[in-house]
Amino acid sequence: MKEAPVIKLRELLNLLPHRYPFLLVDKVLSYDLEKRSIVAQKNVTINEPFFVGHFPEAPIMPGVLILESLAQAAGVLLGLVLENDRNKRLALFLGIQKAKFRHAVRPGDILTLSAEFSLISSKGGKASARACVGSQVAAEGELSFALVDKESLD
């Protein structure tokens, strides 16, 4: 595995189509193309737009956004695997199976996002993913992706 931080925000913007307020990965701590795994990080702050309504008196990061941050971390790895096709293809999050929410994520938490792909093909991929705050698992599940030509989205 490459040592941290191997990919910072500026390079992430070249690997993901997401932008503020929907970019939910701050940096990649490590990745291994041979093992098809990645570890990334999201620093959760009180300034996140979703905390305005979820919930003002007791802010908790919505579970669906924890899953989205996992999908984005996995998408970074797909972007690295695509390498030469990165500008032509896009990874789309298709779905999640076996999703479990185990621990609340609050302002000030550092969310560690890890994913390991069991399948990567020209059509997409499947990955096991886990989001943790410290040693506590916040959420986990099996993610599915499709790889599509960007031109087909026009």
From Swiss-Prot:
Active-site residues, Swiss-Prot/TrEMBL: H54
An annotated GO BP: fatty acid biosynthetic process
Single GO term (MF): (3R)-hydroxyacyl-[acyl-carrier-protein] dehydratase activity
Listed EC numbers: 4.2.1.59
Keywords per UniProt: Cytoplasm, Lipid A biosynthesis, Lipid biosynthesis, Lipid metabolism, Lyase
A cellular component term, taken from the record's GO annotations: cytoplasm
Subcellular location: Cytoplasm
InterPro entries, per the entry: FabA_FabZ, FabZ, HotDog_dom_sf
Enzyme class: lyase
Catalytic activity: a (3R)-hydroxyacyl-[ACP] = a (2E)-enoyl-[ACP] + H2O
Domain of life per record: Bacteria
NCBIfam families assigned to the protein according to its UniProt record, in alphabetical order: fabZ, PRK00006.1
Task performed by this protein: Involved in unsaturated fatty acids biosynthesis. Catalyzes the dehydration of short chain beta-hydroxyacyl-ACPs and long chain saturated and unsaturated beta-hydroxyacyl-ACPs.
Family: Belongs to the thioester dehydratase family. FabZ subfamily.
HAMAP family cross-referenced by the UniProt entry: FabZ
Protein name, UniProt field: 3-hydroxyacyl-[acyl-carrier-protein] dehydratase FabZ
Gene assigned in the entry: fabZ
